[in-house]
Amino acid sequence: MNASAAALNESQVVAVAAEGAAAAATAAGAPDTGEWGPPAASAALGGGGGPNGSLELSSQLPAGPSGLLLSAVNPWDVLLCVSGTVIAGENALVVALIASTPALRTPMFVLVGSLATADLLAGCGLILHFVFQYVVPSETVSLLMVGFLVASFAASVSSLLAITVDRYLSLYNALTYYSRRTLLGVHLLLAATWTVSLGLGLLPVLGWNCLADRTSCSVVRPLTRSHVALLSTSFFVVFGIMLHLYVRICQVVWRHAHQIALQQHCLAPPHLAATRKGVGTLAVVLGTFGASWLPFAIYCVVGSQEDPAIYTYATLLPATYNSMINPIIYAFRNQEIQRALWLLFCGCFQSKVPFRSRSPSEV
């Protein structure tokens, strides 16, 4: 009995000594896995490689004997995946409605369909990135995914700009715009938009990345600082153009309201309320776009790869919300989209509102 007790005490002493040696080794400089990503792994748009450092697409996740990943899932990655799922579901519905309803194939709804398609691809990209990051970690797949996401979000922002231009022209040249605008012209505009977006997405895949030179990495790996600066500058230009056009739209709306007031010798309350509502809607549209993307675009310029990864997550996640809100602003508020929804979910519904092509300012 005494011998077994002594052996037990001796084993406990050895265990304590081993734990002390491990703690000393850690204090002396053993690598730390960090709290914002899986052990020995970091992923762009996914778990950062520690509390400090940019998000990285390359992931080397530890696997167990059976090949299953044993690393903990980053909660930020889960939020991005959930956001992508909601985005994909909403925009898939919009794309299906426009594609299946002949009355919604006008130039205006083609622009809305382009926006919904871009956001749908962005949502699918967020989901696939989560899957590949934790199931099939690979630098090649990571480059493809970041290129896919860059192209999708670039197409989304470009489609928003195209819709803004369409709104402005429809109000500024109201008498001649609809007779000149054709589906072919809209398709050519969107073809140019998607070509530029695809080109931006292909740049990392074609070699403009920081996999070979980690010192050139931005806050989102494997994108280089120069590439991120180009994307941010492009966004600022697009945002500036949209801001200018929306200010001009407000001026046109108020001028029309003033002309009505002169004709009627007073501004009738219904016209005043409609004008204020229209201006308020434009403010919400532009404010939502700016609040979603500006923080991430600014941080991409001023941030560095040594900054905590949580900063990138905290600015990137709201940017994805813009693709979640776009269907509500540009599609589900439209009466024809609402009627198509009723017909989809309740075929017996008979709406008294006839199909007609609403002006882009009403979308």
Curated annotation (Swiss-Prot):
GO terms for biological process: positive regulation of cytosolic calcium ion concentration. Keywords: Cell membrane, G-protein coupled receptor, Glycoprotein, Lipoprotein, Membrane, Palmitate, Phosphoprotein, Receptor, Transducer, Transmembrane, Transmembrane helix. Disulfide bonds: none annotated. The keyword Glycoprotein applies. It is a multi-pass membrane protein. Disruption phenotype: Deficient mice show reduced striatal cyclic AMP production and selective alterations in instrumental conditioning. Glycans are attached at N2, N9, N52. Residues 96-107, 166-186, 251-278, 333-363 are cytoplasmic. Residues 1-75, 132-143, 207-231, 306-310 are extracellular. The modification Phosphoserine is found at S357, S359, S361. Belongs to the G-protein coupled receptor 1 family. This is G-protein coupled receptor 6. It comes from Mus musculus. The lineage of its organism: Eukaryota, Metazoa, Chordata, Craniata, Vertebrata.
